[in-house]
From Swiss-Prot:
The gene is hisB. Keywords: Amino-acid biosynthesis, Cytoplasm, Histidine biosynthesis, Hydrolase, Lyase, Magnesium, Metal-binding, Multifunctional enzyme. Pathway: Amino-acid biosynthesis; L-histidine biosynthesis; L-histidine from 5-phospho-alpha-D-ribose 1-diphosphate: step 6/9; Amino-acid biosynthesis; L-histidine biosynthesis; L-histidine from 5-phospho-alpha-D-ribose 1-diphosphate: step 8/9. It comes from Xanthomonas campestris pv. campestris (strain B100). This is Histidine biosynthesis bifunctional protein HisB. The keyword DNA-binding does not apply. It comes from the Bacteria. The active site is at D8 (nucleophile), D10 (proton donor). Pfam families: Hydrolase_like (PF13242), IGPD (PF00475). Its main location: cytoplasm.
Length: 375
């Protein structure tokens, strides 16, 4: 899914003269900060579409040739800096015509509204006039009004690029079935004490490890049919958490993607081939997690438990919880644990996953960590 940044031209990409017509080369001036901001947005995965009202373009008072020269030069300068527009959409009507193709109308948007590859949740409109904001509202996307002397506005290009490209990675997932009601809220870019309430105190304690050692804000609330058993509550919590991770990560641009142990980790156990992920000790126990946000869910568990349950959590549901997270998040996870104390082994698994997550979700730039072009 590709986000689109729809942009006005005059007053947004290039400054608008007093007569509101850029019909000569000497009138061509770029808005401050537009090129570095658009480069940042390009690197964040955005495509660009110009949507502009040009009153009476092609008429005697505004000949097409007078428009084409400065416009083509503008496009060439943008292209020379690595900024290419997917399309340039121009409405030539007069305001009195009330044409559906004239902003804030969305008549020119029909092909885009039919395009299922567009990520509308991240798409936005940038312009200098209130009609640009109304246009955004008609498309049900976010609108940014640039700050200008003529029309007001609250934004500059640097702020817009930061808001869209560096937006906090948050998600709120509500999963309701006849068996459970689960709510998961997380913010991958904010550190906060985790809050969990599932009706299963030991399970709550384990979920807290994910937020605490993963380094992100996590709030999980669950109501389930515990009068039957713990299965539905634990399983559905895993599914909701996995979905929240998937939504918060978005297209995964800029993340580390992988969580694993460095080759020279002091915690590696000689001769034990299971220790190949992020390896964590807990007294006599050692747990290892290696993961990949590949979009292809796969789970491998290597370990066993002697007790039927630890606290109120059946040990058979420990790997089942992690499998549920993988299925809903598109995560490939290898989890290995060795030890004697089952409490330590279960907790070690949760902590190892959390530390591997911390590494994988860390932002390391703006590139997509895949040669396929999508994750």
């Amino acid at each position: 899914m590709t986000p689109i940044l729809f942009v006005d031209r005059d007053g947004t990409l290039i400054t608008e003269p007093a007569d509101f017509q850029i019909d000569a080369y000497e009138k061509l001036r770029f808005v401050e900060g537009v090129i570095p901001a658009m480069l940042k947005l390009r690197d964040a995965g955005y495509q660009f579409v110009i949507v502009s009202n040009q009153d009476g373009l092609g008429s005697e008072s505004y000949p097409q040739a007078s428009f084409d020269g400065p416009n083509n030069l503008m496009l060439q300068i943008f292209a020379s800096q690595g900024i290419v527009f997917r399309e340039v959409l121009i409405d030539c009507s007069w305001p009195a015509d009330n044409a559906p193709t004239r902003k804030p109308g969305v008549g020119l948007m029909v092909p885009y509204l039919q395009d299922r590859t567009i990520d509308w949740s991240r798409s936005a409109m940038v312009g200098d006039r209130i009609t640009d904001i109304q246009f955004a509202q008609n498309l049900n996307i976010r609108g940014f009004q640039l700050r200008t002397e003529q029309f007001g506005g609250d934004w500059d290009w640097a702020g817009i690029a930061h808001e869209l490209a560096d937006a906090p990675r948050r998600a709120v997932v509500q999963r309701n079935t006849k068996e459970t009601r689960i709510r998961v809220e997380l913010d991958l870019d904010r550190v906060a004490e985790p809050h969990t309430a599932t009706g299963l105190p030991f399970f709550d304690h384990m979920l807290e490890q994910i937020g605490k050692h993963g380094g992100f804000a996590l709030d999980i609330r669950a109501e389930g049919d515990l009068h039957i058993d713990e299965h539905h509550t634990i399983e559905d919590t895993g599914l909701a958490l996995g979905q929240a991770l998937r939504e918060a990560l978005g297209d995964k641009r800029g993340i580390g993607r992988y969580g694993f142990d460095p080759v020279d980790s002091p915690w590696r156990v000689a001769g034990d081939t299971a220790q190949h992920g992020f390896t964590l000790p807990m007294d006599e126990t050692i747990a290892s997690a290696a993961l990949d946000f590949s979009g292809r869910p796969y789970f491998v568990f290597d370990g066993d438990f002697k007790r039927e349950r630890v606290g109120d959590m059946p040990t058979e549901l420990v790997p089942h919880f992690f499998r549920s997270v993988c299925d809903a998040s598109g995560l490939n996870l290898h989890l290995h644990v060795r030890g004697e104390n089952d409490h330590h082994k279960v907790e070690g698994c949760f902590k190892a996953l959390a530390r591997a997550l911390r590494q994988a979700i860390r932002r390391e730039g703006t590139a997509l960590p895949s040669t396929k072009g999508a994750l």
